[in-house]
Amino acid sequence: VSADPSDVILARMMSLHPKIIDLTLDRVWRLLAALGHPERALPPVIHIAGTNGKGSTQAMMRAGLEAAGQRVHAYTSPHLVRFHERIRLAGRLIEEDALAALLDEAEAANGPDPITYFEITTCAAFLGFARTPADALLLEVGLGGRLDATNVIDRPALCVITPVSMDHEAYLGPTLGAIAGEKAGILKRGVRAVIGPQEPAAMAVIEARAEAVGAPLFVANRDWQSRRERDRLIYEDDRGLLDLPLPALPGVHQIDNAGAAIAGLRLMGLDAAACEGAVTRPEWPARMQRLTRGPLAQSAPGIELWLDGGHNPGAGVAIAATL
């Protein structure tokens, strides 16, 4: 099977920097300038950081925005099967021709200068987002937040920090507080931020950062709460109560993720119908996904098979609670 043109370009991009991860924004700013600063021409950005639940929260927010009739860009990582999964333009996965053209343009603008794979592909994605009309961009952090390639948006419409857990300590720091400090690096002056449930050590750091930069926080179990009650999702904030179906995404942890998504949608002025769409319409593969078809399921008749991409202690706790 011949490789797609984008696969060939992506393979070349892997060789532009000796490290897969090297956290700094210098190279990103250089390339964005060479590309004409596409990050300044984006639709309203919802910037999402956190250790666990970023993808699920993003998927629910996208479902809610789309239920309200909005055209939504989305940027996520990593991908499961094909790189194209990382970039949605106005609700649709990017097509091969468009992806190859964006990667070509970013590669030509960068030349031989060192840059990591995630940095150059993020810059390419910004080109696509800037050139395609949409009402919102859901922008998921790749790693950390403060020095992540996505953290070049001066004034997002909203920030979201999902639960922080121990992960990638070699890059983000050896303690929960240090990791939370990196995640809180996405907070911006005057930009509201939804904060999912946090351990006290993480919450203290997030609150200190928010106070330092002047970012208003909308915090789980203080300003909003979500809970399961009689097979319904109950969400409450100062605007009132929503009685909604349980999230379509399985897992007890999705109650918290749904709460963060709904909190964000309500801060952006969306109504109850959009919030219901957020919990009933999302799809997010490999997150507590039961395998009922395919060769693996056929090879284990009578056995329940579940697929989940969790890879840190917080995710392990969530999986155990669900099972």
Describe the function of each predicted region.
Residues 42-44, 131, 135-139, 147-160, ...:
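Nucleotide phosphate-binding/pyrophosphate-handling subdomain across enzymes
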Residues 61, 125, 206, 210:
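Aromatic/hydrophobic pocket-lining residues that form π-stacking "cages" and hydrophobic walls in ligand
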Residues 1-21:
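Charged, amphipathic alpha-helical linker segments immediately N-terminal to NTP-binding catalytic cores
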Residues 19-21, 25-43, 66-154, 170-172, ...:
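ATP-dependent carboxylate-amine ligase catalytic core
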Residues 48, 56-73:
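A conserved segment at the C-terminal end of the G1
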Residues 135-141, 156-245, 258-276:
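Acidic, Mg2+-coordinating active-site environments of NTP-dependent enzymes
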